Design a protein with these regions (language model features):
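Bacterial Sec-dependent N-terminal signal peptides
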Residues: 1-29
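Long, intrinsically disordered, low-complexity segments
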Residues: 21, 109, 189, 265, ...
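Membrane-proximal, proline-rich intrinsically disordered regions
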Residues: 21-69, 419, 430-433, 663-679
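Conserved, well-structured interaction surfaces
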Residues: 43-62, 82-156, 173-215, 428, ...
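Extended amphipathic alpha-helical segments enriched in small hydrophobics
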Residues: 146, 222-223, 510-572
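Short coil/turn linking the two alpha-helices of tandem helical-hairpin repeats
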Residues: 153-154, 158-160, 205, 228-237, ...
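Segments forming glycine/polar-rich beta-alpha architectures that bind adenosine-containing cofactors
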Residues: 344-347, 353-449
Length: 679
């Protein structure tokens, strides 16, 4: 692009850190002067303002973790929302072709791609930035451009790839009408850009810059892109033979290629090797707490004794860690993002944590989960299926016969010794006792204790450390004529800090979006290896060419990926029989990801890439019987279909549709299969 070409700089503030997110999101403030790119990219402030505009396009409909307004795909078969009428049912029926929810992702992503491309083509030196800083800024722009393409590819399927210099806005619509590239072409471009970005980006960020990517983030996203490319949805999927361009070009590979799994495994191995060598990334763990400091921070509960794991320190066992706190603290804001070695990439808080009215923030996400007692909306619920998926304390599966066997059995002072693997209070149904630590860090079951320690006003202090009930007639139970109640009778505790409260002078702790975690890399590695045929070896060069990996279905390497995640959770590793059997191992990985990444948007896309979504999202949603009051509490826990949450799945819902407005602008764009085209 000509350096003397004048462009309008849509500027936002410089900050990308946690303390300035409210300013960062104020994208309505524009820098009105028209300035040449030469002047802009020779000035540090203007350059960083330009880059900040690119970051702003990661917000809104491009968020990956949030409440239903911006992240409806954070609600698969695991969690639901009960607000604003039939929005959930419409989403589940795929009635969102030309609705505003989620459709801005296309435009916002290409805005970010275009602006990042201009920066990459114009910024080579800057009088106020050191050469190292210039390289890092270029790396950030390159990462963002690749990440926007990745978000588009995952959601919409194959997408147009603009020229590296960016589209020339002076051209007519017809001249800018690019068709979709094939899925493999998209993957090749995105991964190659991430490899370059990995050589440009800084390795570490402080807490004020935590929302900026690092070398590790580039390598991790690269692994994620390769994993999706190897998955059944886009690897030899003949059911997508009709996903074509207008000239008839097929966009989804029709022949299965096992080597793609080897590439995915090698890419994950790249990140694992880099993490271990640099010491920058690992699973977060919290040391054993020998003495309770507060009711909200209890003494460590040791998992049931296991001869192999109970006496070994992490990662070979759990003797020196608190599995419950290790998982809970990952998400609830008790540790600074920059001090969390598991967090590879995050958007930060996505808003101002001090303003409880701010939309699209992690704080607002939590407010949707909080009971009305504590000033929350009380509209996010967990499905019965998800609550049943959590194991018992010893790692065995939850037995659905318990609904009959334990009918009428509740905790009390006399049976405390029978449920020593939890901190459940009295009056709680027995099915919620003796469960694995991740259950108690994630599930707000009926009778769970909410701490709300930040309450300051005298009128609310008695509500600290309070049990919340969802029985009909209870303060937070079913309310006729209102949306503000937990429709499944099972709430969500994940992301909630013991201090969180939205009334009585309380506040909700600042917390960051867990966009990409090291646990994901480990489980991706194991999954990819599992899909390689027994006895087959692939030689794959590392991302930087420094070594060659011998990739095969190596059970010990698969264990290297799974075991640390299980040890951190306080549950036993899989048996040798599971590691030996690819089908059984896949079933375990599906389950492990369902639990480990609950409410992180992973489930929605995992089910699709595995091509098992129809059997999961197509089934009816069950919950507790919220029509029952406390007098009939034994009936509350008998599973019932939640009639208000109608759901279905059709083939078209594998990918999102392109809106009519975008199809009008680009005559060369084809619509995703099953969706109405614009003629």
């Amino acid at each position: 692009m000509n350096k003397n070409k004048y462009i309008l700089l849509g500027a936002v503030v410089l900050g990308l850190g946690l303390t300035s997110c409210s300013d960062f999101l104020n994208v309505d403030r524009y820098f009105r002067d028209q300035q040449s790119t030469e002047r802009i990219f020779s000035d540090k402030d203007y350059t960083l303002q330009w880059l900040s505009f690119c970051y702003s396009r990661l917000q809104g409909d491009n968020l990956e973790v949030g409440h239903s307004d911006v992240c409806p795909f954070n609600f698969s078969d695991d969690q639901v929302f009960n607000e604003r009428g039939d929005r959930f049912a419409k989403f589940k029926r795929g009635e969102y072709l030309n609705s505003t929810g989620g459709q801005n992702a296309w435009k916002w992503s290409y805005d970010g791609i275009y602006q990042a491309s201009i920066l990459l083509n114009e910024l080579y030196e800057n009088e106020d930035l050191t050469p190292e800083e210039v390289t890092d800024v270029r790396g950030q722009a390159r990462f963002l451009r690749a990440y926007f393409y990745w978000l588009l590819l995952r959601k919409f399927g194959p997408i147009p790839i603009l020229p590296p210099e960016g589209a020339d806005y002076t051209k007519s619509y017809d001249e800018l009408a690019y068709p979709r590239k094939t899925y493999d072409e998209c993957v090749a471009f995105i991964t190659s850009e991430l490899e370059i970005a990995a050589t440009e980006l800084f390795e570490k960020r402080d807490n004020l810059n935590i929302a900026r990517p690092t070398k590790g983030a580039a390598l991790a996203v690269r692994a994620k892109v390769f994993l999706y490319a190897a998955s059944p949805l886009v690897n030899g999927n003949t059911e997508m033979a009709d996903f074509i361009n207008k000239d008839g070009q097929q966009l989804i590979p029709q022949e299965y290629n096992e080597e793609k799994w080897a590439k995915a495994a090698a890419a994950a191995r790249d990140m694992i090797e880099y993490s271990e060598t640099s010491g920058l990334y690992k699973l977060y763990t919290f040391e054993r707490r020998p003495v309770s400091t507060d009711e909200a921070y209890p003494t460590t509960i040791e998992p049931p004794y296991h001869e192999e794991y109970s006496n070994k320190p992490f990662p070979e066992g759990w003797s020196n860690i608190d599995p419950f706190e290790s998982y809970r603290s990952l998400f609830n804001g008790d540790i600074y993002a920059a001090e969390n070695p598991e967090l590879i990439f995050t958007r930060g808080t996505n808003g101002d944590s001090n303003d409880l009215k701010t939309d699209n923030t992690m704080v607002d996400f939590v407010k949707h989960q909080l009971p009305g007692t504590f000033g929350g909306y009380n509209v996010h619920g967990m499905t019965l299926k998800q609550s049943e998926a959590y194991a018992m304390a010893d790692g065995t599966s939850f037995d659905k016969e318990c609904y009959t066997l334990w009918k009428g059995k509740f905790t009390n002072d006399e049976n405390k010794d029978e449920h020593k693997y939890d901190n459940v209070k009295n009056g709680v149904w027995w099915g919620y006792t003796n469960r694995e630590p991740r259950f108690y860090a994630s599930v707000a079951f009926n009778g769970a204790q909410w701490n709300a320690l930040s309450i300051k006003e005298e009128g609310g202090k008695d509500s600290r450390n309070k049990q919340i009930w969802y029985y009909r007639g209870a303060t937070d139970g079913r309310i006729n004529g209102s949306d503000n109640w937990c429709i499944t009778g099972i709430g969500i505790m994940k992301y909630v800090n013991p201090n969180d409260c939205a009334k009585w002078g309380g506040s909700i702790y600042q917390k960051v979006e867990p966009t990409l975690r090291y646990a994901d890399i480990l489980l991706m590695y194991a999954e990819a290896l599992n899909n390689i045929s027994e006895g087959t070896h692939y030689q794959v060069t590392s991302w930087d060419g420094s070594q060659t990996y011998d990739i095969f279905r190596d059970k010990e390497q698969m264990r290297r990926g799974v075991k640390p995640v299980r040890m951190r959770a306080g549950v036993p590793d899989y048996s040798d029989e599971v590691y030996e059997n690819p089908k059984k191992f896949f079933e375990k990985i599906v389950h492990e990801r369902q639990i480990e990444f609950f409410a992180e948007t992973q489930r929605y896309y995992d089910l699709r890439r595995w091509k098992i979504v129809e059997e999961h999202e197509g089934e009816q949603i069950y919950g507790c019987n919220t029509l029952m009051n406390e007098e009939y509490k034994d009936m509350f826990y008998l599973p019932v279909r939640v009639a208000e949450l109608q759901t279905s799945f059709s083939r078209k819902q594998y990918f999102w549709p392109i809106s009519f407005d975008e199809l009008k602008r680009n005559n060369n764009l084809s619509q995703a299969p099953g969706w109405q085209n614009y003629d």
